[in-house]
């Protein structure tokens, strides 16, 4: 499985998990999208149906800052754009905030949902808080794991409705 990172150099280099993956040779820096493109603005939700894409072509993470990001940074990147369902950040910068995942967290979530749990856990060792993300989202990740897009959207809708009722 290949992991690619497109780096827009908008993050603090010391906190940038995409760059860390490249530095550790766990990902390859690229300017071209390949395989699954993790895109928080995509209409399509990642699901087990995307596993063949992961195996054949890999996954591309677009590393940018949540403070300065827009759809424009994603729309010109070729590949199969997918968004992740609701998950909560475990990183120290956005801890507990829905959808505001680091590049590493997005990668771990993708692997977990696509039933590559051992790989997700392997990547969680890259940073001190990696296991925090997995533990914080364990119930959600297990609910999404190995499910098709419709099932994941249904689960996500139920979770959001439950949160809004509180």
From Swiss-Prot:
Keywords noted in UniProt: Cytoplasm, Ribosome biogenesis, rRNA processing, S-adenosyl-L-methionine, Transferase
GO biological process, one term: enzyme-directed rRNA pseudouridine synthesis
InterPro entries cross-referenced by the UniProt entry: RNaseL-inhib-like_metal-bd_dom, Tsr3-like, Tsr3_C
GO molecular function, a single term: S-adenosyl-L-methionine binding
Protein EC: 2.5.1.157
Catalyses which reaction(s): an N(1)-methylpseudouridine in rRNA + S-adenosyl-L-methionine = N(1)-methyl-N(3)-[(3S)-3-amino-3-carboxypropyl]pseudouridine in rRNA + S-methyl-5'-thioadenosine + H(+)
One of the record's GO cellular component terms: cytoplasm
Binding site for S-adenosyl-L-methionine: 17, 62, 84, 99, 103
Protein location: Cytoplasm
Top-level enzyme category: transferase
PANTHER family (alphabetical): 18S RRNA AMINOCARBOXYPROPYLTRANSFERASE, RIBOSOME BIOGENESIS PROTEIN TSR3 HOMOLOG
Family: Belongs to the TDD superfamily. TSR3 family.
Known role: Aminocarboxypropyltransferase that catalyzes the aminocarboxypropyl transfer on pseudouridine corresponding to position 914 in M.jannaschii 16S rRNA. It constitutes the last step in biosynthesis of the hypermodified N1-methyl-N3-(3-amino-3-carboxypropyl) pseudouridine (m1acp3-Psi).
Protein name stated in the entry: 16S rRNA aminocarboxypropyltransferase
Organism: Saccharolobus islandicus (strain L.S.2.15 / Lassen #1)
């Amino acid at each position: 499985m290949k992991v690619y990172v497109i780096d827009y150099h908008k993050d603090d280099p010391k906190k940038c998990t995409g760059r860390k993956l490249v530095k550790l040779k766990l990902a390859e820096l690229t300017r071209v999208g390949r395989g699954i493109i993790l895109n928080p603005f995509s209409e399509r939700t990642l699901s087990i149906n995307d596993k063949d894409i992961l195996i054949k072509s890999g996954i591309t993470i677009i590393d940018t800052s949540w403070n300065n990001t827009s759809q424009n940074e994603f729309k010109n990147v070729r590949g199969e754009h997918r968004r992740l369902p609701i998950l909560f950040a475990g990183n120290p910068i956005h801890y507990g905030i829905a959808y505001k995942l680091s590049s590493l967290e997005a990668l771990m979530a993708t692997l977990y949902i696509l039933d590559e749990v051992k790989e997700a856990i392997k990547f969680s060792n890259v940073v001190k808080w990696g296991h925090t993300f997995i533990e914080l989202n364990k119930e959600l990740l297990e609910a999404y794991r190995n499910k098709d897009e419709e099932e994941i959207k249904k689960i996500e809708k139920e979770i959001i409705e439950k949160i809004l009722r509180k």
